[in-house]
Amino acid sequence: MALAGPLKVCIVGSGNWGSAVAKIIGHNVKNMKKFASTVNMWVFEENINGRKLTEIINTEHENVKYLPGHKLPENVVALPNLTDAVRDADLLIFVIPHQFIHKVCQEISGKVHKNALGITLIKGIDEGPEGLRLISDIIREKMNIDVSVLMGANIANEVAAEKFCETTIGSKNKNHGLLFKELLQTPNFRITVVEDADTVELCGALKNIVAVAAGFCDGLSCGDNTKAAVIRLGLMEMIAFANVFCKDSVSIATFLESCGVADLITTCYGGRNRKVAEAFVKTGKSIEELEKEMLNGQKLQGPQTSAEVYRILQQKNMVNNFPLFTAVFQICYEGKPVEDVISCLQSHPEHM
């Protein structure tokens, strides 16, 4: 790796999580000679009460739409043009909804220098003709750069409020993982680096499906014992899925990192997927309607990931091996009754 400092950082995305990460990076780079002191952040331009969102961020230093109430450091510069934002960047932090990754990579392919490094904070997967494709694989293929991943029990508003949490960086090149740890770690944002990157990334995507099931249980007022069963059986399906679909060997220890069981717990109790799934049961409205009503422009990942997982499992004739993942998809998209989530627990293969 021939990166010469100070390294220029660009954050590709500026939603709730992207803005929280921008706050960390903006503060950290001020005190480190290794990194350039200005941080570019690509912002999908929106109009907020007659003003451009980039203008608000650059003058008031707050993302009033996606992270209100938290000041961003003044060295974080919002740019509406993606190509301008990534120009000359050495380190790219990808933090956008997973459904936009193809479009973003196509736009900046060939515009980033060959020694640049990426890290994806995107929780989701893609499916192609060969089945599973990880978001990091898409970035790697389209951008021709090395990509690490960061996943963990990180509810963005709590991270922005500097409440203590942990996270996991997965990097097949340990030195690249350690470089991103240096950029991102703070006393209240503690990072472990592991080499089992594909498992780290899969955990971040699959836990959102389990959180939807947890939200269904909350909507049905099932109680904490049932939710604990959803979390445990969901974790078992996550492990089984990783064992089938990961190209490299899977370490069970990775599921004990923040990206695994910790992220699963926090998402099943505090995340947006759980919240919307509970409302789905109580209101009878569609997932799409609730996303528009409840999330202030943010995207829901769990239902869409369940659909992608379902199609991947169909290709392998393995739908019946993953009853919880399947039930979430069928309830969200095929009109199956929400109570099916309970019957899938009752007859789960783990009990047979």
Curated annotation (Swiss-Prot):
> What GO CC terms are in its UniProt record?
cytosol
Binding sites annotated in the UniProt record for NAD(+): G13, S14, G15, N16, W17, G18, A156, R272, K299, Q301
Q: Does the keyword Membrane apply?
A: no
Query: Which residues of this UniProt protein bind substrate?
Result: K123, R272, N273
Q: What Gene Ontology biological process does one annotation of this record name? A: carbohydrate metabolic process
> Which reaction equation describes what this protein catalyses?
sn-glycerol 3-phosphate + NAD(+) = dihydroxyacetone phosphate + NADH + H(+)
Keywords, A to Z, come to:
Cytoplasm, NAD, Oxidoreductase
Q: Where in the cell is it found?
A: Cytoplasm
- The protein's name is Glycerol-3-phosphate dehydrogenase 1-like protein
Q: Which organism is it from?
A: Xenopus laevis (African clawed frog)
